[in-house]
Amino acid sequence: MEKVPMTARGEQLLRKELERLLKRRPLITEAIAEARELGDLKENAEYHAAREEQGICEAQIRDIEYKLSVAQVIDVSKMENNGKVIFGATVTLIDCDTEEEKTYQIVGDDEADIKSGRISVNSPIARGLIGKMEGDEVAISTPGGMKDFEIDSVEYR
């Protein structure tokens, strides 16, 4: 089974969500039992809604348990920062044309959220940065075409 990289933050968020779902599980079972007492199951909307909710909850639990089982948790905050862009690093780039500054953290696919500045390790930007060093200039394929950036800083937080 191939391991999938995940940040310590990503693991923590998944474990928190799993805990929430596991606490929800008995409440759903209770709702099914209460709905079952209402009578005819064929026309019992409460029963069918609770069973559907149970199915969704169980699927989410299985999904999270699987993700955690294949996760290779990488905590860069415990690594010595040598200025190299690696998985989990937070990288500040300067657009060579506009001098605009952008900061991204390179994370696993499931953790990516561009609005929060977290990009997937498999994204074109991250692939163009991995292995490069602070101070390097890089050409990265973006939706608007090739762009040149300078790696201003690399942090392991």
From Swiss-Prot:
Stretches of the chain forming a coiled coil according to its record: 14-37
InterPro entries named among the record's database cross-references: GreA/GreB_C_sf, TF_GreA/GreB_CS, Tscrpt_elong_fac_GreA, Tscrpt_elong_fac_GreA/B, Tscrpt_elong_fac_GreA/B_C, Tscrpt_elong_fac_GreA/B_fam, Tscrpt_elong_fac_GreA/B_N, Tscrpt_elong_fac_GreA/B_N_sf
Gene Ontology MF terms: DNA binding; RNA polymerase binding
Keyword Cell membrane: no
Biological process (GO), any one: DNA-templated transcription elongation
Keywords per UniProt: Coiled coil, DNA-binding, Transcription, Transcription regulation
One matching Pfam family: GreA_GreB
Described function: Necessary for efficient RNA polymerase transcription elongation past template-encoded arresting sites. The arresting sites in DNA have the property of trapping a certain fraction of elongating RNA polymerases that pass through, resulting in locked ternary complexes. Cleavage of the nascent transcript by cleavage factors such as GreA or GreB allows the resumption of elongation from the new 3'terminus. GreA releases sequences of 2 to 3 nucleotides.
Family: Belongs to the GreA/GreB family.
PANTHER family the record matches: TRANSCRIPTION ELONGATION FACTOR GREA
Name of the protein described by the UniProt record: Transcription elongation factor GreA
Organism encoding this protein: Vibrio vulnificus (strain CMCP6)
Taxon lineage: Bacteria, Pseudomonadati, Pseudomonadota, Gammaproteobacteria, Vibrionales
Name of the encoding gene: greA
